[in-house]
């Protein structure tokens, strides 16, 4: 390993990427978590919408349930049924229902997102290590990982929210990836994901960040739904997603993972000029 001493700016190149899973590399539209959360709340008699589920997307799944229970709309529906707003015991109960449902849903949504394998080829060809972070827990990833591998995708490092003290937006999964990959400084790493939580995670870790708009949770459309959408409507929706990501601090926004290699080249140019995230 080449030793870098921080007595001068790091001038490149990019050494690693940390990729999200659902909505970024697999599961176009990030459908698996949405299905599982809706079904888990339905078991308690509480109806929630896909748009409500997508709001906190990217968080550790327990934190996601907690965030959903804290929504005024969901909290009010819960109060109407049970005479009180949901408490921490309720969060744990719903999360307990969510885990097996999520495992089943993940298994049904393991297709690779178009453009991933060419991007992986670029990373490999340029000596860029591939790490991953996810709001999924280890049991969920134990189902997803072999299915992705059969389709040709096997990252060098897989870090789950259950592997670290706190999930996104805390940077600990990014730190664990850097350790597992033996990569530093952190400005040599690029975090790529499809949620605001991904972007905040990368920024908090001191990494470059790329938001993925078209295949991700914020847009929230399957490929078939995307194809059926009028072009003007799609452009407007993508512009809104891009705006949200840039407001959150993303350095770059692309439509899908296949566009990331050209952004890596741009980041290499910025690093060579002494720029940092």
Curated annotation (Swiss-Prot):
* Similarity-based family: Belongs to the HAD-like hydrolase superfamily. PhnX family.
Catalytic site residues?
20 (nucleophile), 61 (schiff-base intermediate with substrate)
Q: How is the cofactor bound?
A: Binds 1 Mg(2+) ion per subunit.
**Gene3D superfamilies hit by this protein:** HAD superfamily/HAD-like, Putative phosphatase, domain 2
Q: Where does the source fall among the domains of life?
A: Bacteria
| The protein's name | Phosphonoacetaldehyde hydrolase
Subunit structure of this chain's protein: Homodimer.
The molecular function terms in GO held by this entry are:
metal ion binding; phosphoglycolate phosphatase activity; phosphonoacetaldehyde hydrolase activity
Q: What's its job? A: Involved in phosphonate degradation.
Q: Which GO terms describe its cellular component?
A: cytosol
Please give the cofactor(s) recorded in the UniProt entry for this protein: Mg(2+)
Assigned EC number: 3.11.1.1
UniProt cross-references to NCBIfam families, sorted A to Z: phosphonatase
Q: Which Pfam families match?
A: Hydrolase
Keywords tagged on the record: Hydrolase, Magnesium, Metal-binding, Schiff base
Covalent S-S links between cysteines: none
CDD domains, per database record: HAD_PHN
The record ties this protein, via InterPro entries, to: HAD-like_hydrolase_sf, HAD-like_sf, HAD_sf, PGP-like_dom2, Phosphonoacetald_hydro
- List positions binding Mg(2+): 20, 22, 194
Q: Which GO terms describe its biological process?
A: DNA repair; organic phosphonate catabolic process
Root EC class: hydrolase
SUPFAM superfamilies registered for this protein in UniProt: HAD-like
Catalysed reaction per UniProt?
Answer: phosphonoacetaldehyde + H2O = acetaldehyde + phosphate + H(+)
| Taxonomic lineage from the root | Bacteria, Pseudomonadati, Thermodesulfobacteriota, Syntrophobacteria, Syntrophobacterales
